[in-house]
């Protein structure tokens, strides 16, 4: 596994489930096309699995 993941919000959270909105916020993403680097661990991978239809993930 990589040390960090680069996450980009590619779809809007308008109309998404409230728990998905909270997950996107917890990942450090706000506006559309915002990007954040997070550590690669099991907790983050679980969060990404929940919102995989809204984000793009790159290993760095």
UniProtKB/Swiss-Prot annotation:
UniProt xrefs under Gene3D superfamilies: Ribosomal protein L30, ferredoxin-like fold domain
Biological process per Gene Ontology, one example term: translation
Gene Ontology CC: cytosolic large ribosomal subunit
UniProt keywords, alphabetically: Ribonucleoprotein, Ribosomal protein
Molecular function GO terms recorded: structural constituent of ribosome
Pfam families recorded: Ribosomal_L30 (PF00327)
Protein family (similarity comment): Belongs to the universal ribosomal protein uL30 family.
PANTHER family given in the database record: LARGE RIBOSOMAL SUBUNIT PROTEIN UL30M, MITOCHONDRIAL RIBOSOMAL PROTEIN L30
Known partners and oligomeric status: Part of the 50S ribosomal subunit.
Annotated protein name in UniProt: Large ribosomal subunit protein uL30
């Amino acid at each position: 596994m990589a040390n960090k993941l680069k996450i980009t919000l590619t779809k809007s959270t308008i109309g998404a489930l409230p728990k998905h909105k909270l997950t996107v916020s917890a990942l450090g993403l706000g506006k559309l096309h915002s990007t954040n680097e997070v550590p690669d661990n099991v907790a983050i991978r679980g969060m990404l699995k929940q919102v995989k239809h809204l984000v793009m993930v790159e290993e760095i």
